């Protein structure tokens, strides 16, 4: 899905929660992430992803 393998990251995003703390991975690109999962992915009940460097 185009995720950037810049760091190790395990994340879980619910539709109503887009403020997941990302401080442990300062190199993570929010812009790239949101552009990657823009609709029609949002209608999913939840998006769970695991990124390995």
UniProtKB/Swiss-Prot annotation:
Q: Name one GO cellular component term.
A: membrane
Which keywords does UniProt give here?
A: Membrane, Transmembrane, Transmembrane helix
Answer yes or no on keyword Membrane.
Answer: yes
Q: What is its main location?
A: membrane
Membrane-spanning residues: 13-35
User: The organism sits in which domain of life?
Assistant: Eukaryota
- What subcellular locations does the record give? Membrane
**In what way does this protein cross or attach to the membrane?**
Single-pass membrane protein
Protein name per UniProt: Uncharacterized protein YGR146C-A
Protein's organism: Saccharomyces cerevisiae (strain ATCC 204508 / S288c)
């Amino acid at each position: 899905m185009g995720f950037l393998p810049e760091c190790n990251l395990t994340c879980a995003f619910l539709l109503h929660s887009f403020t997941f703390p990302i401080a442990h991975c300062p190199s993570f690109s929010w812009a790239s992430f949101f552009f990657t999962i823009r609709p029609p992915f949002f209608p999913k009940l939840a998006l769970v992803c695991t990124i390995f460097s």
